[in-house]
Each structure stands twice: as structure tokens, then as C-alpha cells.
From Swiss-Prot:
One of its GO terms (molecular function) is glutamyl-tRNA reductase activity. Pfam families: GlutR_N. This is Glutamyl-tRNA reductase. The keyword Transcription does not apply. Its EC number is 1.2.1.70. Belongs to the glutamyl-tRNA reductase family. It is an enzyme of class 1 (oxidoreductase).
Length: 335
């Protein structure tokens, strides 16, 4: 649903994004920034800025961003709070906000250059915000067009092929640790990253893969166990954690036994991490910080022509948005 009576985007109010990514921050810092942005929801209440403000929170393994149509002082206050962590967030407004999200959705701003997962992550963040709030026309327009053009950009071959991906890196790490392909692998959470890793490992010959989720998944071809039946005493050689909510969804007594199997390896794909850092065995635990370091070693440079072409598309949509808002103002004034 689109908000009525939306305020014009201008000098006082910006369509903007504030956030951090793998470039500026460690995983721990991104977790802290995510907490700040989640707590900032109170800043969007009417008693703070005289009217309700809408926003979209995008949180992935490698970035945490908040998009909103809001006064400059709101973005400034968030930036100041984030800077207290020793982090310098980026802030893009209006046409630069458009250009940024278009490049994100197109995979050109990803650590895994050209990855496709980010398209789904952006879409889910947008749809969740649309379910929970009455989003402004500007935010609807921004996300719908970024998702559309990201898809078109890939279809035309603009996005580079991602030669090194997280599933490939996980496969390489299992080989390095000499994990047998008959070893029992457990994936907790039916997240996109868990699915992509599981199906890749299955294609590589790993034959004993189990998924654990809230309920049975009728279309899943792999073994399944529901959360109520999960037991870390079972001989899972490798455990993959695909959701940050697992830390609170599973009982503490269960987590205490996750390291009981000698030499068990745990991959924690969640942001925030599913396992607190003080509870892990470092030589048996891999989180997104380590994976990010591996990806940086293999990252390709962005093709400047691809970047320029996608930004130009974004700028055209920004101009189109302003024209639409002006027409709405004229209709409202003449009503």
C-alpha cells in the first residue's frame, strides 16, 4: 500500500540509504550496525518527526543498509551513532541512492561479483517492509525498478559470471580438511545460502545431507529432521547454520552439545552470527568474516562500462520519479 499525502523529495527530505558493507567493516561491526538500525525504528514514529516515516532494512552477509524517505537530520543522527563504533558509514541520497541500489541488485557491488543471491535478498527485504508498513510511492518505485533492471542487466549478460562463490569456497575448505564425501552434513535453516551450498555439495558427490527446519518440506529431495528432533549427539561431521534466529530458536541445552563430536566443523553463515564468538572453537568454526577474506583474494574488478551503464539507467528512473511526483502535486493542487 502506498502512503497518501507524501511529502515532496527536496532539500529537507531525501530518498536516501545509509549503511556499511564488507568494504568498511568486519562481521562484528556489521552486527553492531544492524542492531543500531533495528533500534532506530523508534526514530520513525510520528512523535519524533511529526509524521510516520517508512523504511526498508536490507541485511545480508556482506551489507547492512537502511533506505528511507526522511529528513537529513535522521540520517545524520544514525551516521553519528554508527561512527561511535569506529566505522564510517556511507550515505547516498536521491539519484545516488538510485544508482547504489541498482548496482547492488545487479550484483556489481557484491563481494562475489555478479552473484545472483543478492537479487532475492533485496526482493525479500522490500516485500517484508511492504507487508509491515505503508511504504511511500518513492520507495516502491525505487525497489521495483531496481529489481526489474537488475534482472534485465543479468539477462543481457551485463553481470559478470561469478567464478568463485561461497558454495565453491565451502567445497574447497571441506577438501582441504579432507572431509569424506560420505560424511554426514547437517544444514540448519532452509535459507538461500544453505540451499545453494547443499545442492552444490550434492553435485560434487556428498551423499549424506540432512536439512533441519521448522517443519517438513515436501519438495525437498534430501533427508529432513524437524527442530524438535534435532540432536547434536548424532554424528554430523559438518554443521551449517543458515539463520541468525537459530541462536534463540533452539534451546541453550542443545547448543551446549554442538562441539561434543570430536573434529566437528561448523560453518556459520548468519549475520548476526548464530553462535556467539566466545562459545566457539576457532579451529573448528568458520564464519562470514573468514569467508569474506577468502572471497577478497579472488574478487574480480568491476567493469567500469557495466557500472556506468547501470548507473545511467538508475539516473533515468530518478528523473522519471521526480516527474511523476510533480504531476501528482499538480493534480493535488488543482483538486
Amino acid at each position: 500500500m502506498v502512503r497518501e499525502g507524501e511529502e515532496r523529495i527536496g532539500n529537507r527530505v531525501s530518498l536516501g540509504v545509509i549503511g556499511v558493507s564488507y568494504r568498511e567493516t568486519t562481521l562484528q561491526q556489521r552486527e553492531q550496525v544492524l542492531h543500531i538500525l533495528q533500534q532506530a525504528q523508534g526514530s520513525f514514529r510520528p512523535e519524533v518527526f511529526q509524521e510516520e516515516r517508512d523504511y526498508v532494512l536490507l541485511a545480508t552477509c556482506h551489507r547492512v543498509e537502511l533506505y528511507s524517505v526522511a529528513p537529513a537530520e535522521l540520517f545524520d543522527s544514525l551516521a553519528q551513532e554508527i561512527e561511535l563504533l569506529g566505522v564510517s558509514p556511507y550515505f547516498y541520497r536521491n539519484q545516488d541512492c538510485f544508482a547504489h541500489l541498482f548496482c547492488v541488485a545487479g550484483g556489481l557491488d557484491s563481494l562475489v561479483l555478479g552473484e545472483t543471491e543478492i537479487q532475492g535478498q533485496v526482493k525479500r527485504a522490500y516485500l517484508q517492509a511492504a507487508r509491515e508498513q505503508k511504504l511511500s510511492f518513492a520507495l516502491h518505485f525505487l525497489f521495483q525498478k531496481a529489481l526489474k533492471e537488475g534482472k534485465v542487466f543479468r539477462a543481457k549478460g551485463g553481470a559478470p559470471y561469478a567464478e568463485i562463490t561461497i558454495p565453491i569456497l565451502v567445497d574447497q575448505e571441506l577438501r582441504r580438511r579432507q572431509i569424506d564425501k560420505k560424511a554426514s552434513l547437517l544444514f540448519i535453516g532452509y535459507s538461500e545460502i544453505n540451499r545453494s551450498v547443499a545442492y552444490h555439495l550434492q553435485r560434487q558427490g556428498f551423499s549424506c545431507i540432512t536439512f533441519c527446519s521448522r517443519q517438513q518440506l515436501p519438495t525437498l529431495s534430501m533427508r529432513q529432521v524437524v527442530r524438535e528432533e534435532l540432536c547434536f549427539q548424532d554424528p554430523y561431521r559438518v554443521v551449517f547454520l543458515g539463520s541468525s534466529e537459530l541462536q534463540y530458536a533452539l534451546p541453550h541445552s542443545l547448543w551446549e552439545s554442538i562441539w561434543d563430536i570430536p573434529d566437528r566443523i561448523v560453518f556459520d553463515f548468519a549475520v548476526p552470527r548464530a553462535l556467539p564468538s566466545h562459545t566457539v572453537f576457532p579451529h573448528r568454526y568458520v564464519d562470514m568474516d573468514q569467508i569474506s577474506d577468502w572471497l577478497r583474494e579472488h574478487r574480480k574488478e568491476v567493469n567500469s562500462a557495466h557500472l556506468h551503464s547501470l548507473r545511467e539507467v538508475a539516473y533515468r528512473y530518478w528523473n522519471s520519479l521526480n516527474q511523476r511526483l510533480e504531476r501528482r502535486d499538480c493534480v493535488g493542487a488543482n483538486a
